[in-house]
Amino acid sequence: AYATRFWKRRGLVPEPIDVLAVIERRAKRYYGTSSDITGVVRLADSREAEALQPETPETRFDWVITSPPYYGMRTYIPDQWLRNWFVGGPDAVEYTNRAQIVHSSPEDFAADLRQVWRNAESVCAEDAKMVIRFGGITDRRADPLDLIKSSLSDSGWRITTIREAGTATEGKRQADAFLRTKSKPMVEYDVWATRP
């Protein structure tokens, strides 16, 4: 809503985009080649155990690779609606956060993530590995590493490695597009975990 008002007040008009060409490129990339590699991508609320259930009860996952919303990022779904639409999501933006991880406090946020990790653990093989890309946003007074470590405690996963993954590059930070003073992106981390 803010961005739309900003453009209208200034009489700005976006450059024309051939939406069908964008869709065609995506379709060719997604459906143009097949691979012997198998895997599953889920678009669901992973706090719900049934969201992660495999096709058959005996199937177990070997890898979980994820990047959950960062603490305080309440507009995660609306900000990603176009990407979501390309993979089958709704064709309109829904400005609500009712189906998102709780952001009321760092403790509540970590507890919600812990439920996700427990649900993932319950459908993984004994030697499964999980990799989490996690960071923070600058206006939150919570340490991303403390949050992710807290979320993984008593979750069925044990942290084996934490690596700095750098920061989001300035050119890719949509939050800075209309700001006079650019914010400094926080360091992101790759957290590796295994089942104990």
Give short role names for the model-derived ranges.
Residues I23-G39, V116-A128, S155:
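A structural motif corresponding to the C-terminal end of an alpha-helix
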Residues R141, L145, K149, G156-P196:
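Class I S-adenosyl-L-methionine
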Residues L20-I23, L113-Q115, L145:
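Well-ordered, non-membrane alpha-helical segments in soluble/globular domains
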Residues A51-W63, P69-K129:
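SAM-dependent methyltransferase catalytic-core segment centered on the flexible catalytic loop
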